[in-house]
Structure formats: C-alpha cells, structure tokens
Amino acid sequence: MVPSTFLRSKPARCLPVLLATLIFAGCGTHTQDQSAAFMQGTSQANSSFYLQQMQQSTNDSKTNWQLLAIRALLQEGKKQQAIDLFNQLPANLNSTQAREQSLLAVEVKLAQNDYQAARNLLAKIDPTNLEQPQQARYWQAQIDASQGKPSLTLLRALIAQQPLLSDAKQRQKNIDATWQALTSMPQDQANALVINADENILQGWLDLQRMWFDNRNDPTLLKAGVKDWQTRYPQNPGAKMLPTALVNMQNYKPASINKIALFLPLNGQASIFGRTIQQGFEAAKNGAPSVTGSAVPAQVAQAANVSGNDDVVSPSQAEISDLTATGSRADPVQAPTQDQAAPAAEPAAQAPATSTTPQTTASPATQPVTAPAAQPQPVVATAANPSAELKIYDTTTQPISQLLAQAQQDGATLVVGPLLKENVEEVIKSNTPLNVLALNQPEKVESRANLCYFALSPEDEARDAARHIHQQGKQTPLLLVPRGALGDRVVSAFADEWLKLGGASVLQQRFGSTAELRAGVNGGGGIALSGTPVSTLPSAQNSILGSADEMPVSSGGSVDAAYILATPEQIAYIKPMIAMRNGSQSNVTLYASSRSAQGTAGPDFRLEMEGLQYSEIPMLAGSNPSLMQQALSAVRNDYSLARLYAMGADAWSLANHFTQMRQTPGFELNGNTGDLTANQDCVINRKLSWLKYQQGKIVPAS
C-alpha cells in the first residue's frame, strides 16, 4: 500500500507547478498574439495604449508595440515624439518588423516635409511584400510624396490604392484625387504619357481626360461625353463612382445674366477705382475687343516697346487690396493725384450714385468681337450683350445687406462686386441667394455654391510668381519686400504657394522707404542676397537691409532667385545695390511684380534692369492692343487704373461664364488680366504674362 500512496501523492504535489507554468505560458502567448494582431492592422488603438504596452513588454513584443506607437503618434500629429521613438528602435528586427520600420521611415520623412527623401525610401520598398493594410499606407505615402503634382507615378498610386479602400468616403476621396490629378495636368504632358498595354484602368482614365480636354468649355458636350465614357468603361472605378466635380456637372444650368447688379464704390476714397472698373465692364458689355490667346507671350511684348507708350506713367502703383484691406489703411499706396484721377472719372459721370437707375450708357466705338477659333482651347472671347440690363449700386450709400435685398427686389440674377474687402465679408454674412462675383477676396475664403472671388492683389501676383519661379527650376528664392502689412501679405502668399509646389524654405529681407534706399546707394552699402527664413522672421522688421551675417541663408543652399516687390523708383535703387554687393554676373535670377514695371521706361532704365523678369497682365503685355489703347486713353495713361479697366472687362466675361467657373473643373478663360481659372472654392486664379529686359528691349521671358 505504501508504493500506491506514494504514486498518488507525487502528481498531486506537481499539479500546482504545472498549472502555474501553463497559466504564465498562456499569458505570454496572449500578449504576443495581441501585438501581432495590431501589427497586422486588424486592431487599432491610440498611442497612449501602445506606449503603456511597450513599457510592460520585452523582446519582440516590446518592439512591436514600439512600432505601433510610432505609427499612432504620427497619425496624431505628435511628430517629434514619433521621431524620437523611431530613432530608439533596436537594430535587430525580424522580417515583419523590418517591413513596418521601412514604411514608418517614409512616413517620418513625410511628416518632416522631406519629400525627396521619402521618394528615395519608397523606391526601395516592394509593395508586393507588404500586408494589405501596409500596401494601402504605401500607396498613400506615394500620393503624399507627389505633393499633388500631376504625374504618371501619382495616377498609378491612386489607382493601386483604390481597391484597398473599404470606406465609401475614402473611395470617393480617391476618385476625386485621381480626377484632380488628371485635370491639373497640362495637355502637353498628358499627350506625352506612355503606359503599359495591361493598364486598362489607367487607359480608361486617360480617355476620360482626353474627352474633358476636348469639351471642358462646352457643358452640353461634356455631359454627353461623360455618359458615353461610362458606357465604354463600365468597370472603371470612376464610371461606378463619378468624380464629385463631374457629378456636379450633370446638374449644370447656365446662370441668367439678363439683369446684372454692379456693386461698386462711387463716392469716397475708392470711387476712382469703382468708376474705372465700371468703364471696363460696360466697354466689354458693349463689344470691346477681346484678348487674343493665352497669357504666355509670343510677340506680345512688342506693345510695351512702341514709342507711343513713352508718356505712360508707371503701372501698378495703387493695388486694390492696399486701399481696401479690412479694418485698416496701413501702408496704402498713394492713389492717383486729383489731376490724374479726374479725367478717368469723367466718362463715368453719367453713372448715377444711386442704386436704382438702370445703366444704358454705350461704350465708345470699338471693333467687333472676334469669335474664337473652333478648337478645344480656353475661352478667349465673350459676346457683347448690350441688351442685358445693368444697374449700378453705390456701396457707399447703404449697408450691403440692404443693397442685396434691393437688387433681388429689382430682379437681378447676378451681382458683380462689391470691391471693398469688408463689403465682401458682409456679402458672405448675408447668405444671399443671388449669384455673386465678388471683386475682392476676404482674408478667410468661404466656399459657397453661389459665390466666386475675383481680385487683383499683390498676393495673387505673388502666388503666380511662385509658380513661375518654381517652373524655372529655382530652389531657394529670396523675397525682397517693403516693411509693413503689404510685405507681410506678399511673403505669406508666396511662401504658402511655394510650399504647395513642393519647394523648401523661402527667405525674406525687408527694405524701407525710397529715401532710405537712396541713402544706402550713397553710402555704398549694397544689398546681400541672403535672408531669414519666412517662418522665423517677425512680421515687422526694424532694420532696412541686414548684412549677410544678420540674414543667415537656410540650410537648403544659396539663393538662386530673388522676387522684388517695389515701385519703379525703389527698384531703380535696389537692382544696382544688388549688383554693387554681388557683382553683375551673379547667377541669381531677379524677378519683380508688375508694381515695378515702368511705362515711361527709357533706354537707360531698360539697360539698368537688364535680365530682370517681371509679371504683367496680358492686356498691358500686348495680348489685346486695341483694348489697351482704349483703356489707357480712358484713364490718361495711368497703368494702375488701366489694370482696373481690364478687370472690369474680365468681370463681364466671368459673369457670362459664372456657372462654368463655379461648376466645371478646369474651365479656363483667356482674360485681359490673366488666364483665368477657378479653384474648388471658386477663387479665380490668374496666370500672368512674364516679360524680361534684354539689351534695352522688353521681350517675353522664357
């Protein structure tokens, strides 16, 4: 009996040890399985949870939680914490962890806005080796690294990502992004694309793009083309779920312009601007000559060289937004003097300063409008419509809300204006049901289905300059701008656009008055082509022109472009001072806004400005010589007012194409103030003409 008792007691004594071993083994397995499930993307949590699990784990499990925490921190916008944790990853990773680490390395570079490094890392990853959730992230990283620049790489990434998305909103976002890439691609680039024979989905998208290129300015043909495309490519993701922009096109109805209400200031400080815009608007309504072709100059610069322009005063010395900045008149550019302004107002003297009298004043005799050639190009002409009823409402007489109510009661179908920024903001607050083409842009744009924004402003010109300079392959631009609010606005607009284009840091340097610049020339100081990064410079800088030591160049490299915002008098000092400090053979290309353009420029000035590129509205660059002559005659050769005259003419064209601008993606109008397109908020963008001083002449900039 003793042996029997011994045998029974031995298992009994071992049982607690075995149970404990099984329990702990089970716990360890559960933890490992849990981190693996999160790694595979089947579960999600926030960074706090992952960090806590990481602290409580060891070995591979701890590394898994660390990788998950990095991913969550990046998603939560905690960039620096994610980078620090990423740098603490162990060197020895298993294959699963190594794949996740390689993807996180890309996402870290994207968080740092180091897009080139991200693209280099992506090139080393084979997406077929990734798990499906990782593949979706890989393709999103490819999309982000492209920075929205239309390319075959971007299109392929979007197409590859689409089937990996399960959420309907994400799929629609993907379809819309694909369409945005297609419609923002220049037609020459699209025509040069070469794809593989088995890329059926991409082929379908490119066929839709070609149809859109051919019919984008004809809503009826565009709608029919979309339906035909859906029939021919029924399995294309875009046919099953149309891009939002094309869905909106299915409901296209042209806006009526039988009764137009023109909201302008006809009294007070801005009246000269309001009356000049009115003149241009009425001239176009009654058949003024239309612009011929796009803003890209061919021989258009010749108009700027003719001797008949020798008595033209310097252009663009009075920007609209300088005068109409909300709640402030800080640093305004001087308006034309009374003897200059009066003649411009005389032709508009018939216009009543009340809000109730229809305007039927005919414009001066003009050439008939030339119809555009029948080709899939931007609209270049808008037919005259003298029978359209036009009423002028003086925005200085009543609150905007009352004028809008009066216009609606008068039967207006479209409002053009107001001009002042504060009045535009009042329109937004009013929630009017009328279609409104505002002639300025508020600080914060609100997207409304019945509202578009059309402004001539230094900011608008700065954005175009950023695009032009980036297109010329420049990497490190310096902004030479005046102290004060005007300089702040231009710097902000340029830098924002530069970042969108994928550029690195932008440098800036401020200067003072013309008298201070003159003193600098007399002192032999010169201007160093260096500056402080935009993100770190205070909004108001006290020094006139800092030394090279005071203005450190960013780590991105030496300056290769300088954009100058100055009057003709100021740039006459600035350019020689740049040469004085840097030598005339500097490799830095100089650019200027139209504010610097000199209608009275003689041979000496043109030689002094050798190599300088500057922007100009197409009308004053020579794209519409007849209207240019008419406008300059009306405003006594004041170029700044001639710009507003051109703006008025373009406002008429935009009014006639209001619905297309609002609803048709990629719709483009060749205007007197630029090639006009609208973004998704219906902010009208202008592509300007770029000219250059060369051997004493003005020629198109390459």
Swiss-Prot record:
Compartments, as annotated in UniProt: Cell outer membrane
Assigned GO CC terms: periplasmic side of cell outer membrane; periplasmic space
Signal peptide: 1-26
Lipid attachment locations (S-diacylglycerol cysteine): 27
Record carries keyword Glycosyltransferase: no
Biological process, per Gene Ontology: peptidoglycan biosynthetic process; regulation of cell shape
Covalently attached lipid (N-palmitoyl cysteine), positions: 27
Gene this chain is encoded by: lpoA
Protein name: Penicillin-binding protein activator LpoA
Major localization class: membrane
